[in-house]
């Protein structure tokens, strides 16, 4: 009988490669690509409550000045591990200020991503990052608030990918949008922008 390999172990080499590539490239990333700055009154964001390994988490109770949020899923073959690795590099690049920032990974695939799975996945990139899951209704409510696109691709209910938007959201303590970082925004730029809001 073939032993099923979990998403974290399956993509462990890719996670390691993403982290290593970022560390090697960090000093040379000087192409400034501006993050998408949130405008006053932008209809993106808001506090929400989802499940973590420690129980329900209300983002209003995090107690940090800023929150970085990424929406993805643990079976994601490439984009999610790359972006979470980048988010971890930004977090570490803040130095002593990192304690003033929370990092959250929210699943867009709650049917497969249990709380335990998203917790293990998020912590593989940064031990302080929290993984959040919940039922489909609650997840979709949060996705609508954050204007996240996600659509299953494939007919097999147990073996499919999810096409989804990919942005790192930077929110303040009121869960108001401060900046959106695309995959093209380099790490030094992200670090600088996060620091401007601390």
PLM regions with names:
Residues 1-49:
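N-terminal targeting signals for export/organelle localization
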Residues 43-44, 65-66, 163-165:
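Short, small/polar residue-rich loop motifs at catalytic or cofactor-binding pockets
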Residues 60-83, 87:
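Short active-site neighborhood of thiol/selenol oxidoreductases, capturing the structured segment around
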Residues 84-142:
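Structural microenvironment flanking redox-active thiols in thiol-disulfide oxidoreductases
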Residues 197-198:
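Short, hydrophobic alpha-helical segments
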């Amino acid at each position: 009988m073939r032993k099923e390999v979990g998403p974290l172990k399956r993509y462990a080499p890719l996670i390691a490669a993403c982290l290593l590539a970022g560390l090697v490239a960090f000093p040379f990333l000087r192409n400034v690509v501006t993050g998408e700055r949130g405008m006053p009154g932008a209809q993106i964001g808001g506090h929400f409550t989802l499940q973590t390994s420690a129980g329900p988490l209300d983002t209003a109770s995090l107690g940090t000045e800023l929150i970085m949020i990424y929406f993805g899923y643990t079976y994601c073959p490439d984009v999610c591990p790359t972006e979470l690795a980048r988010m971890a590099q930004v977090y570490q690049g803040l130095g002593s200020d990192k304690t003033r920032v929370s990092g959250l990974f929210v699943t867009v695939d709650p049917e497969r991503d249990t709380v335990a799975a998203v917790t293990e996945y998020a912590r593989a990139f940064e031990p302080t990052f929290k993984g959040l899951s919940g039922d489909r209704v609650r997840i979709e409510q949060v996705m609508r608030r954050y204007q996240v696109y996600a659509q299953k691709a494939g007919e097999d209910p147990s073996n499919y990918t999810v096409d989804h938007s990919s942005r790192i959201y930077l929110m303040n303590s009121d869960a108001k949008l401060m900046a959106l970082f695309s995959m093209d925004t380099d790490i030094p730029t992200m670090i600088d922008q996060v620091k401007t809001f601390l």
